[in-house]
């Protein structure tokens, strides 16, 4: 009889511990998931602030932030977020030497067990300064 009580107790203890581990974890959410800068004048620098929030019940750790190319700098405001806390992710794109449609991806590595690497993207159309000036002059004639 004691053996059955031990088995039942062990089962409930395992279930409780497992449920605690599953439901107590960080959960990272980023907003917006994508952004379009529209037209960007060549050789200019543009910036967008994305926001990452911890919707989980444990501390979210931002382990690393990086971009798909050296033309983009990414900086996290904080590296540790308590539950329901958020921070800015500043993304700066340098269009120097670029031309045409640009598609870039930013990666955030976290301790979120269900979403350890968050990917979000931005786009833009880099136009040459002369073409931009021409567009402005043509627009003012209308």
Specify the residue positions occupied by each region the protein language model found.
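Buried hydrophobic-core signal for structured, non-transmembrane domains
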Residues: 48-54, 91, 104-109
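Bacterial N-terminal signal peptides
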Residues: 10-20
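Long, low-complexity ectodomains and other extracytoplasmic segments of secretory-pathway proteins
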Residues: 23-45, 49-51, 55, 113-142
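Short structured motifs
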Residues: 31-37, 72-77, 89-92
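Extracellular/lumenal ectodomain signal focusing on beta-strand-rich modules
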Residues: 32, 39, 62-64, 105
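Surface-exposed binding patches on compact interaction domains or structured appendages
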Residues: 57-88
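Bacterial N-terminal signal peptides that target proteins for export
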Residues: 1-12
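Short, surface-exposed loop/turn segments at beta-strand-coil junctions that are enriched for proline
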Residues: 94-100
């Amino acid at each position: 009889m004691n053996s059955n009580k031990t088995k039942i107790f062990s089962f409930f203890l395992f279930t409780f511990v497992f449920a605690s581990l599953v439901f107590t974890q960080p959960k990272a959410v980023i907003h917006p998931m994508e952004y379009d800068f529209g037209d960007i004048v060549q050789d200019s620098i543009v910036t967008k602030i994305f926001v990452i929030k911890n919707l989980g019940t444990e501390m979210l750790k931002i382990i690393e932030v990086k971009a798909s190319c050296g033309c983009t700098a990414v900086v996290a405001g904080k590296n540790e977020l308590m539950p329901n806390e958020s921070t800015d992710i500043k993304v700066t794109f340098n269009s120097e030497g670029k031309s045409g449609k640009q598609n870039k991806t930013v990666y955030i590595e976290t301790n979120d067990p269900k979403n350890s690497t968050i990917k979000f993207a931005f786009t833009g159309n880099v136009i040459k300064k002369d073409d931009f000036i021409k567009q402005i002059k043509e627009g003012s004639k209308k």
